[in-house]
Regions:
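Hydrophobic packing residues in well-ordered alpha-helices of helical domains and bundles
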Residues: 50-53, 57, 95, 99, ...
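Helix-turn-helix
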Residues: 1-17
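Short, surface-exposed loop/turn segments at secondary-structure junctions
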Residues: 41-50, 89, 173-177
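Conserved alpha-helical segments that form or flank metal/cofactor-binding pockets of metalloenzymes
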Residues: 68-71
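Alpha-helical structural segments
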Residues: 17-37, 55, 59-62, 73, ...
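C-terminal peripheral helix-coil segments that are non-catalytic and often amphipathic
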Residues: 104-208
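A contiguous pocket-lining binding segment that forms or flanks enzyme active sites
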Residues: 82-120
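Secondary-structure edge/capping motif, primarily at the C-terminal ends of alpha-helices
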Residues: 34-45, 78, 82, 168-172
């Protein structure tokens, strides 16, 4: 860059401010990659929701594998004294604003799917009361017109996707798998099942 570390602080008020902007830029980069993948899939498939969901998840995995350090900064162990995302929707939090762009790509798919093809979700009285209260709080923060059970399903999908990608990025599948690509396909099939979609057995793209 042709710039010393001290010179960077002429543009940022503190180390945390610098990290916030780095994280925000990274979130914006991921969101752009995912959005482009969704658009390509929608065009190629004529708007098939399974294809769009698969493309979004694959784009997230591909970015994470190509940028493991950046993935670790956003989604790994927080740096001492620094939290990448301070809170959802904080208008004064640059990185939260950028993180919303990232999560918004997945949420937009989820909202579209729910509006076009609602899928079975647990009723409120089938959800643990403590969990239900948290789901309602998160739903209200999103401003989403969804039942709590649908929010639960969204989070279950994210946990599966994030868990699989994290295990692969950080090398925690090496004890059993040299190439986790097919395992990732099984994860996508699980997500599709939760969302009432069919994931064809030949949807996978092989190694890598």
């Amino acid at each position: 860059m042709g710039m010393t570390a001290p010179a960077l602080y002429r543009y940022f008020g503190s180390r945390e401010d610098l990290l916030q902007h780095v994280c925000g830029d990274i979130f914006t980069e991921i969101a752009a990659d995912i959005h482009a993948a969704i658009v390509r899939a929608a065009t190629a498939s004529g708007g098939d929701m399974t294809a769009e969901l698969s493309a979004a998840c694959r784009a997230f995995r591909a970015w994470a594998l190509a940028q493991p350090r950046e993935f670790g900064l956003l989604f790994g162990t927080p740096l001492p004294g620094f939290e990448a995302v301070q809170g959802h929707g904080d208008p004064d939090d640059f990185v939260a604003e950028c993180a919303d762009k990232f999560s918004g790509e997945f949420l937009a798919l989820f909202y579209e799917l729910w509006s076009k093809h609602p899928f079975p979700v647990p009723a409120d009285d089938e959800i643990d009361p403590g969990l239900l209260a948290q789901l309602v709080r998160y739903r209200d923060a999103l401003g989403a017109d969804l039942p709590a059970g649908a929010v639960l399903t969204f989070l279950r999908c994210w946990v599966r996707l994030y868990g699989m990608v994290s295990l692969e990025v950080f090398g925690h599948l090496h004890f059993a798998l040299d190439d986790p690509a097919a395992m990732f396909d099984y994860t996508l099939a699980e997500l599709a099942g939760l969302l009432g979609l069919e994931y064809p057995a030949n949807r996978g793209q092989g190694t890598g």
